[in-house]
Amino acid sequence: MARLKDKYLNEVQPNLMQKFGYKNIMQVPKLEKVIINIGLGEAVQNSKAVDAAVGDLMAITGQRPITTKAKKSIAAFKLRAGMTIGTKVTLRGERMYEFVDRLFNVALPRVRDFRGISDKSFDGRGNYTMGLKEQLIFPEIEYDKIDKVRGMDITFVTTAKTDEEARELLKLMGIPFVKVS
């Protein structure tokens, strides 16, 4: 069993039940899925950028990403409907817990001048989205082999009904939120 899943079952669930007064264990919010997305604006001119981003995402997550395509043509961006403009991976189950554990404990501490992540990016329905400026913070990515520094969006989808429940869930799981002083 993944270390983070074990922590969730043994520490986080009982704490959340006590704090929010849940009567049933099934009411306790849990992490449902994690979606990692890399938007590729440069893919319009450079089609090799897609392959590089797919390779990076595959190394980071251990799962083959799908490519996302443009829905509409936009002349100002020289974009046609159906062109590949990004890649994304949806992680669930064991892989999700392993990735989140690596993100919190290995990757985020490698960010320069890291003080924690903002707790303002909740969407009102218990989901949290954060952005990373570079893929180099993951130990699976070798500095010499990347062609371009790319950022990514990471969305944590929870079963929480409110942002307060989701914030508490993620805090107990070990997400390093900025300390408000």
Swiss-Prot record:
Record-stated family: Belongs to the universal ribosomal protein uL5 family.
The protein's role, per its UniProt record: This is one of the proteins that bind and probably mediate the attachment of the 5S RNA into the large ribosomal subunit, where it forms part of the central protuberance. In the 70S ribosome it contacts protein S13 of the 30S subunit (bridge B1b), connecting the 2 subunits; this bridge is implicated in subunit movement. Contacts the P site tRNA; the 5S rRNA and some of its associated proteins might help stabilize positioning of ribosome-bound tRNAs.
Residues in coiled coil: none
UniProt GO BP: translation
UniProt-recorded name of the protein: Large ribosomal subunit protein uL5
Protein keywords: Ribonucleoprotein, Ribosomal protein, RNA-binding, rRNA-binding, tRNA-binding
An example molecular function term from Gene Ontology annotations: rRNA binding
Subunit-level organization: Part of the 50S ribosomal subunit; part of the 5S rRNA/L5/L18/L25 subcomplex. Contacts the 5S rRNA and the P site tRNA. Forms a bridge to the 30S subunit in the 70S ribosome.
Gene: rplE
GO CC terms in record: ribonucleoprotein complex; ribosome
Pfam family, one: Ribosomal_L5
Keyword rRNA-binding: yes
Domain of life (superkingdom): Bacteria
Ranges annotated as spanning the membrane: none
PANTHER family on file: 60S RIBOSOMAL PROTEIN L11-RELATED
Signal peptide start and end residues: none
